């Protein structure tokens, strides 16, 4: 699926790659599976083995002609030995990007929900051995707490193997080209388009809230990796800087999205990639896939 339509908003999807993961990697899920079979199969788990499709994909949104790219995937030619599916990729992501009808030159803004390797890779591409910004006319929005988290030269830097080399090949070249705007966690980038804090998965992880002609949606990055986390916010895939804060963030997002009646588009969900959240019994929430 290349285009998602929600209210007056069209969102183009640029797929990079996918893997299959076991639902059990999220934590104890047997009871939840029993309660949510009606929407879980076959899109969000395979009935034969309870594996789910985990996508790497980016979003392009056009708000009154202002074009924003959200979470530009992992990128080609990166040294990512700790994550083999992203190591030294050579994939036609840029060709798929152009197939949406948008060119990189047409992009006004790039927003990375956080600076993990799979959310900022295509910030840059390699030309003649140098990393250069992929979107030459865009302003790249980086949240200040997230830049502090991942700059290896920042005081107290905590290294993690899965994010080695990312700052040098995907962030620093954008800073040096003068295309970056380092902004607070609550920041408006265009009318109706606002960065909002959603910390926990990483120190400065944020989401993007869009409110356009009465349609409200949230690009929630890695606040959720699988829709079952809507019903049990303690489930997680690991790799959180602050797991307790990540849970609190999920709970807050669930109640906000449910009470607004808005849609959310996480970074990694399988088709239809987006959905709503409704209140369910005992203060729990329930995911409703787009189109249901
Ligand atoms: Zn991710």
Q: What are the residue ranges of the model-derived segments?
A:
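Short, P/G- and charge-enriched loop/turn segments at secondary-structure junctions
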Residues: 44-49, 128-129, 195
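Short beta-strand scaffold segments in enzyme catalytic cores
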Residues: 57-61, 205-210
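Active-site metal-binding loops of divalent metal-dependent hydrolases
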Residues: 16-17, 72-75, 115, 145-146, ...
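Cap/insert and terminal regions of metallo-dependent hydrolase folds
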Residues: 84-95, 213-292
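Metal-dependent catalytic neighborhoods of phosphoester/phosphodiester hydrolases
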Residues: 120-130, 276-277
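Metallo-beta-lactamase
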Residues: 1-102, 106-118, 134-197, 215-221, 245-261
């Amino acid at each position: 699926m290349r285009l998602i339509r929600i209210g007056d908003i069209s969102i183009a999807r640029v797929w990079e790659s996918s893997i299959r993961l076991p639902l059990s990697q999220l934590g104890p899920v047997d009871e939840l599976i029993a309660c949510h079979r009606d929407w879980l199969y076959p899109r969000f788990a395979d009935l034969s083995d309870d594996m789910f499709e985990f996508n790497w994909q980016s979003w392009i949104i056009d708000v009154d002609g202002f074009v924003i790219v959200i979470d530009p995937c992992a990128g080609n030619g990166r040294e990512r030995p700790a994550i083999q599916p992203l190591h030294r990729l050579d994939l036609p992501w840029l060709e798929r990007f152009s197939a949406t009808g948008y060119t990189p030159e047409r992009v006004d803004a790039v927003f990375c929900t956080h600076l993990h390797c799979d959310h900022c890779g295509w910030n840059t591409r390699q030309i003649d051995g140098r990393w250069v910004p992929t979107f030459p006319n865009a302003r790249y929005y980086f949240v200040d707490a997230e830049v502090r988290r991942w700059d290896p030269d920042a005081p107290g830097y905590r290294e993690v193997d899965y994010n080695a080399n990312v700052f040098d090949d995907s962030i620093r070249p954008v800073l040096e080209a003068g295309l970056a705007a380092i902004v607070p966690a609550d920041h408006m980038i265009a009318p109706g388009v606002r960065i909002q804090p959603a910390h926990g998965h990483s120190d400065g992880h944020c989401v993007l809230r869009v409110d356009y002609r009465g349609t409200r949606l949230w690009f929630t990055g890695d606040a959720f990796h699988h829709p079952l986390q809507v019903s049990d916010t303690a489930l997680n895939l690991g790799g959180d800087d602050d797991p307790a804060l990540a849970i609190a963030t999920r709970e807050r997002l669930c109640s906000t999205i449910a009470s607004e009646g808005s849609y959310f588009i996480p970074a990694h969900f399988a088709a239809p990639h987006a959905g709503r959240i409704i209140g369910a019994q005992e203060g729990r929430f329930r995911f409703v896939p787009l189109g249901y």
